[in-house]
Structure formats: structure tokens, C-alpha cells
């Protein structure tokens, strides 16, 4: 029973999130995204490992919740924009991006399964994919890391069980 409920939440959750995501002003989304990205990539920024993004734009599209943003490095700082001309684009569903962030899925595997789509500048895409592959959970603030791992465990378990769907035939009320 709980497995079925978890599976339904995992499979229907993104569609439920899409409405609040659409209604949230981009200024608030930008603030949250810049804070989270800055936390996660602070060391990489300090070490110059994100110089490849200086003046170039990465588009990230979370398909199932219809969330898209563009990020770049400007004067050594990660910035998020609502609109930009993307040099490379990454798109995937929220659960797949969550699994990558939690180190439970490999970006290459998702790419070859066509669950992670990378388009645009090949070299820049490879740099970004390698950066995703090198995410160090230990660099995250503990509260964020724990939340990410618990959510990833929940989603992973929910993805293993297909949600139960009732079969209806023509003429039956839905």
C-alpha cells in the first residue's frame, strides 16, 4: 500500500509541482537557484574550474515541471537568467536530475538512454557533463545534502514500482 502511494507521488509529483513553479516569479526562482548553485560550486568557482562558462550560457530545462533557466559565469560569479542565447542546453525530467545530483545515476547512462538531452556546443556540453559527474555531496551544506539524499531515496524507490492504473473500457465512466 505504501509502495503504491510512494509510486503515485513520484510519478504524479512533477505535474503537481508545475503549477506552483509557473506561478512563482522568476526573480524568486533566480534568487533560490543562484544561492543553491553558489553553495554547490563555491569551491569550483574559487579554483577557476568554471572558467569554461565565462561569457557562455548553459540552458537547463526540467521538462516535467516546465522549469527553464540559463546560467553563466560573469566576473567569477554564477549568474542565472530567465532568457539568454544558450551555447549548450541540458534537459531532463526532475527525477533524473535529482538522481544525478544525488550521485545515484550517471549522466552518461541517462544520456545514452535519451533521458538526458544535451544539445549545442559539444565541447562545452562535455565540460558541463563532467562537472555534473564530479558533484561532491560533501561540499553541500549538511541540511541540503540530507534533504537531497532522502528525496533521492524516496524517488528511487518510487520509480521501481509502477503506479497502479485502473483499466477502463469504452462506455465506462472514468
Curated annotation (Swiss-Prot):
One BP term from GO: ubiquinone biosynthetic process
Disruption phenotype: Deletion mutant is unable to synthesize ubiquinone under strict anaerobic conditions. Mutant shows normal levels of ubiquinone after aerobic growth.
SCP2 domain residues: 45-133
Keywords linked to the UniProt accession: Ubiquinone biosynthesis
Superkingdom field: Bacteria
Listed pathway(s): Cofactor biosynthesis; ubiquinone biosynthesis
GO CC terms: cytosol
InterPro entries: SCP2_sterol-bd_dom, SCP2_sterol-bd_dom_sf, UbiT
Pfam families tied to this protein: SCP2
Known function: Required for O(2)-independent ubiquinone (coenzyme Q) biosynthesis. Likely functions as an accessory factor.
Family affiliation: Belongs to the UbiT family.
Name under which the protein is recorded: Ubiquinone biosynthesis accessory factor UbiT
Organism name: Escherichia coli (strain K12)
Gene that this sequence comes from: ubiT
Amino acid at each position: 500500500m505504501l509502495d503504491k502511494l510512494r509510486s503515485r507521488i513520484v510519478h504524479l509529483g512533477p505535474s503537481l509541482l508545475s503549477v506552483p513553479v509557473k506561478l512563482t516569479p522568476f526573480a524568486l526562482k533566480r534568487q533560490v537557484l543562484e544561492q543553491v548553485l553558489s553553495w554547490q560550486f563555491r569551491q569550483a568557482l574559487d579554483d577557476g574550474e568554471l572558467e569554461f562558462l565565462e561569457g557562455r550560457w548553459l540552458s537547463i530545462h526540467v521538462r516535467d515541471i516546465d522549469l527553464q533557466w540559463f546560467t553563466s559565469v560573469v566576473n567569477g560569479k554564477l549568474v542565472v537568467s530567465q532568457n539568454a542565447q544558450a551555447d549548450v542546453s541540458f534537459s531532463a525530467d526532475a527525477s533524473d536530475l535529482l538522481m544525478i545530483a544525488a550521485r545515484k545515476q550517471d549522466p552518461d547512462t541517462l544520456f545514452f538512454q535519451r533521458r538526458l538531452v544535451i544539445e549545442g556546443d559539444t565541447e562545452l556540453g562535455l565540460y558541463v557533463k563532467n562537472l555534473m559527474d564530479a558533484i561532491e555531496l560533501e561540499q553541500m551544506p549538511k541540511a541540503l545534502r540530507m534533504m537531497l539524499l532522502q528525496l533521492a531515496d524516496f524517488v528511487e524507490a518510487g520509480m521501481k514500482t509502477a503506479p497502479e492504473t485502473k483499466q477502463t473500457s469504452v462506455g465506462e465512466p472514468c
